């Protein structure tokens, strides 16, 4: 019996790390009656039920999804074959307790693995530092100690510093502390990337080099925020964004926040209530002046704000983005007297203080929120190499959450930047659809596994992978964001009708000029498609029940059986009922929970349109939500521009919260520990990238297979930065190249003194007398060419067979072909063959006299004309040659996208004349 229970338990010890392994549990939906019964069972006190006490769990203070070497897809060679092997990076979760912390890893197999667990007092912030970028001129002083863990504890290593005033760096390889950074004021958060370690203080920011941990720069002009983030910042791969306390006009970028213009019934009612409140406040001020007492309606915070405004005129809602590589050392000061070195952008984002912000993976999109939490702004940052004043900041979206106030604590992007999830302290995660380039989200943009091309229906690819069949079978056309276009491969988007927004999009994407010039992008207001609510009470999730669904996109967890005190919250949270939430997008891992006996399909993750959303709350339960966008069900007709709706449902859950009975898992770790293996792999890749000798290698690493390719004075800094120098903003090319249309023709120029067979099946020759002198190719004046003197096939059939019709040969002789690219029509009274050169006087007449009145001769001459006609070169642009009996009709239509030539003609089967000494020349239609 005990063995059976041990087998069914979702927890078991890990073989490689020694920690705990938690298997995912399937989430089952309950009916309304089952939910009511479960609620009544939870409300009944434990003493009346007589059931044993549940397992006690430790209190969680904060949760976070971490990015480290373990899930670094760019530098870990294990993930470079991600598309072929199906290998996906694991999810890395950090949980902070009132006594210690814990680190979990969830690989693609779905089994959560405990990697680290300690109990050393309260921990306010912790980060697993990624391996830094280094080269020949920049070495990593802690390479042998990595991976490193940065921790901000209540009691530092020295024991004499104030609480939360030092950052201790521990080696997970050896277990020793390698560095301690002391501060005089409390630390509120830690951020890190491959270049720097950022320590966030109140109204200050300090950055340290990731290789030496020496101070690189610091910022002292941050605007204070009441919480939950006392000093909100956003750290990308290279840029750092923070809230500035003033707006400096000389550094202000073009653009910034636009008016939201959101008017609703709720907003009107709340505005009226605020107006009434302001009126009552004015009455209270009059009472204050008469009685000399402070009315109860005015809080101390309001007085402090007014006093601060009198001392120093601070401006809320200002964002400054700096480049951590070029900002220089020392203090970063944005003032009228300072230069703009290292300042990327400086712009107003909100009217209220900024509460939270986050970059997307590319660093070009920035989402900001204010303290009210009504609206979230999405900005596109287009930099300029000269100064921040030349930078353009486009306000693409306003994500409208609601009219009630809420504090934002977490923001995350999907990997393709088409979805944004904003989580508040109320435990609600709001899912918004966006486009990386702006525009209204719709079926065309969010119902495909790919980010659709904005300007064309075609999937622009380098040919590295096959185009998925869903793009052509399930979607209209080829997922073009431009409505009303033909799905034909040759259809030009210029023939479609564009609305005002699409016209602007065409202008901005095709305009290689200044993005600061008008018209600026029009602001889009987007509502959330899903609101996923977290439970307000902690519950025990069993294998049978699991979380319970109370509605689409809203679930609740079973309440505990025994009475417990309210959960402990973060030190920065002062209001009751607030708890921490973190979210991230990732590949589905619920297949194991739903089909434990089946194997994972190889390409199962590539078939979904949206990745799964993972949400973890302060109760230690990680839940995977499946997201299924679909066209709006109330839409009368489904088209490319149909709005979206979304269905969300929980699929699997992991109970990661630890109990007091769990053992600690502390370094030093074994060599096969996942964190150590990932650190070794990333450092090895860094050595190869810098051209250095990795530790343990038998010999030097050379580039291009030759040691001579590395010069003695080779600069490793240039090789180190080659990835960051890749252009990340490009401009789309024209929809139709010049040579794709009928406005150009390919013609053959024959020099004098040669005889050329025009067609292998034709007897038409081009020859000269022996007295002629050969001339080099294209060495002549076009004005000297007398095309009217050419006698090239002077007899041809009429376009329409008319009885008794006869025209002189001289009427049609030597007239050049005219093709109008705009209208797509041909001049039917012209010949189809043009040859530049001179012919013997009697050659054409002798050839004509033998076949002039025979049908066979007519067919042969037409075949020769087709073999050398310019119309063969523009077949794809709309020219179509059809044969009906003995009548050949040359027709063209601007709407046609494919051409056809009768294959029973000899000229169609005969190849073009090939002569290596006679290249093809490109001439416009107007060539004489």
From Swiss-Prot:
What residues does the Glycyl lysine isopeptide (Lys-Gly) (interchain with G-Cter in SUMO2) crosslink join?
A: 215
Is Disulfide bond set as a keyword in this record? no
The cross-link described as Glycyl lysine isopeptide (Lys-Gly) (interchain with G-Cter in SUMO1) comes at: 215
Q: Which residues carry this modification: N-acetylmethionine?
A: 1
Any one Gene Ontology BP term: positive regulation of catalytic activity
What are the subcellular locations of this protein? Nucleus; Cytoplasm; Cytoplasm, Cytoskeleton; Preautophagosomal structure
Extent of the WD repeats: 69-114
- Show the segment(s) annotated as Disordered: 472-515, 755-777, 868-928
Q: Pfam families per the record?
A: BCAS3 (PF12490), BCAS3_WD40 (PF21034)
Residues carrying Phosphoserine: 461, 480, 488, 838, 886, 898
Keyword Transcription in the entry? The reply is yes
One GO term in the molecular function aspect is: chromatin binding
Task: Specify where the region named Required for recruitment to preautophagosomal structure in response to mitophagy lies, as residue ranges.
Answer: 254-312, 437-560
> Low complexity composition bias: which ranges?
480-494, 505-514, 755-771, 887-901
Q: Organism's domain of life?
A: Eukaryota
- For the site labelled Breakpoint for translocation to form BCAS4-BCAS3, the residues are 824-825
What happens after mutating residue 400 to A? Decreases recruitment to preautophagosomal structure in response to mitophagy. No effect on interaction with PHAF1
What InterPro entries does its record include?
Answer: BCAS3-like (IPR045142), BCAS3_dom (IPR022175), BCAS3_WD40 (IPR048382), WD40/YVTN_repeat-like_dom_sf (IPR015943), WD40_repeat_dom_sf (IPR036322)
Domain comment (free text): Has been proposed to contain 7 WD repeats. This prediction could not be reproduced.
Recorded hits in PANTHER family, A to Z, give: BCAS3 MICROTUBULE ASSOCIATED CELL MIGRATION FACTOR (PTHR13268:SF0), BREAST CARCINOMA AMPLIFIED SEQUENCE 3 (PTHR13268)
Functional summary from the UniProt entry? Plays a role in angiogenesis. Participates in the regulation of cell polarity and directional endothelial cell migration by mediating both the activation and recruitment of CDC42 and the reorganization of the actin cytoskeleton at the cell leading edge. Promotes filipodia formation. Functions synergistically with PELP1 as a transcriptional coactivator of estrogen receptor-responsive genes. Stimulates histone acetyltransferase activity. Binds to chromatin. Plays a regulatory role in autophagic activity.
Question: Can you state the subunit structure given in the record?
Answer: Interacts with histone H3, ESR1, KAT2B and PELP1; the interactions occur in a estrogen-dependent manner. Interacts with beta-tubulin and VIM. Interacts (via C-terminal) with PHAF1; the interaction is requrired for the association with the phagophore.
Using the UniProt entry, name the condition the protein is associated with. A chromosomal aberration involving BCAS3 has been found in some breast carcinoma cell lines. Translocation t(17;20)(q23;q13) with BCAS4.
Which family does the entry's similarity section mention? Belongs to the BCAS3 family.
Put simply, this protein is called BCAS3 microtubule associated cell migration factor
